[in-house]
Regions:
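ABC ATPase NBD coupling module
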Residues: 66-81, 104, 227
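Conserved ABC ATPase "signature" region
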Residues: 110-128, 179-180
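Glycine/charge-rich catalytic "coupling/switch" loops of P-loop NTPases
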Residues: 260-308, 328-363
Length: 363
């Protein structure tokens, strides 16, 4: 039995639908990441699941129990915890902040101290327990927020962009610790984020939201590599998304015409059919000549470098092949290939690197 199930959920604001979830289920012990741009409905969905936001239609079930009924709202809320982007700490010590939820539950002093000791250790804030919460760094404050949530030992924890305001080192460290804590405590979690790297590091499954709807949900690898439409493809990192017309089909492979180029890919398509092709930047190889010809790489195209953009330890290379492509290279590759804006190069990618979305329309 799923831990949480949603049926025909609908939320409106000012008479306008902002959230429509026909069917949703969450398994006990799993971590689900909800990806989507700002305004996609991620926070609205979490607030609705927490019963902190009303809805005009639908049913929510927690362990098979209908929690849509008003009299079950408070008991249900006590079984979950929610962590927001802002820590919202009380004007007191870290110890008292972590103890807040336990005191509301009227736990005994010894049990409170035991819980705080356990979760302060897990979240690495034991040395901060006597500190004034107002003097914490952003990372320390969010760790305190997480300790407060986990100390109640919730059956479900909802995480709404918890890393959004942190610097990169604090974010990386906290994500690693959160992954460890979720696995160690076997707590079921839903993470709302617009950062696909955070989602991949933490989640067993991914859901992608757009305009208040879940447009795709599945195993992380499935969603990342097999998006169902252009919106999902762009959001999960397939920066090159372009349309083509299938010319010839042979077995499980085909050749599509794209801006005058013949692109080989794999897929169950028909000649004359329109398709959307998606390629990840890491699957695009740049060379100064046709060096990849004669290898297993089937697609070799002339291209011009349009823009070079620093991306941490890598550089993103925007390319014009008559259609847009992008690639990532290291500093060493950038120098070895003498890459610069305006330079003509050859781009290569395997037929297996192309993810195909069928349009089921004729060219």
């Amino acid at each position: 039995m799923p831990l949480l199930t949603v049926n025909n959920l609908k939320v409106e604001r000012g008479g306008i639908s902002v959230l429509e979830i026909p069917l949703f289920s969450l398994n006990e012990g799993e971590t689900l990441a909800i990806l989507g741009p700002n305004g996609a409905g991620k926070t609205t969905f979490l607030l609705t699941l927490a019963r902190l936001l009303g809805y005009i239609q639908g049913k929510l079930f927690f362990k098979g129990e209908d929690i849509s009924l008003p009299e079950r709202t408070v008991p249900y809320r006590r079984r979950l915890a929610m962590v927001f982007q802002e820590p919202l700490l009380l004007n007191t010590t870290v110890f008292n902040n972590v103890a807040a939820g336990l005191k509301i539950r009227r736990m005994k002093k010894k049990e409170i101290e035991k819980r705080i000791s356990k979760y302060a250790e897990l979240v690495n804030i034991r040395h901060l327990l006597n500190r004034d919460a107002r003097k914490l760094s952003g990372g320390e404050a969010q760790r305190t927020n997480l300790a407060r949530a986990f100390a109640t030992e919730p059956e479900l924890i909802l995480l709404d962009e918890p890393f959004a305001n942190l610097d990169a080192p604090s974010c990386d460290s906290l994500i690693d610790d959160l992954y460890r804590i979720l696995r160690q405590t076997e707590t079921t979690a839903i993470l709302a984020t617009h950062n696909r790297l955070e989602a991949l590091r933490l989640a067993d499954r991914l859901a992608v939201m757009d305009a208040g709807k879940i447009v795709q949900m599945g195993a992380s690898n499935e969603v990342m590599n097999y998006p169902v439409n252009e919106v999902v493809a762009s959001f999960v990192g397939m920066e090159a998304v372009f349309s083509g017309c299938v010319q010839t089909v042979c077995g499980g492979s085909f050749v599509a015409s794209v801006a005058g180029h013949a692109i080989m890919a794999l897929g169950d398509v028909k000649a004359g059919e329109k398709v959307i092709c998606c390629i990840r930047p890491e699957n695009i190889i740049i060379s100064r000549d046709s060096a990849m010809e004669g290898t297993s790489v089937r697609n070799n195209l002339p291209a011009k470098i349009v823009k070079i953009i620093p991306r941490g330890p890598f550089f993103k290379i925007d390319l014009d092949c008559g259609f847009f492509l992008a690639s990532y290279v290291t500093q060493q590759s950038l120098e070895n290939l003498s890459l610069m804006e305006g330079k003509d190069v050859t781009v290569s990618f395997k037929a297996t690197a192309v993810h195909v979305i069928r349009r089921e329309k004729r060219c």
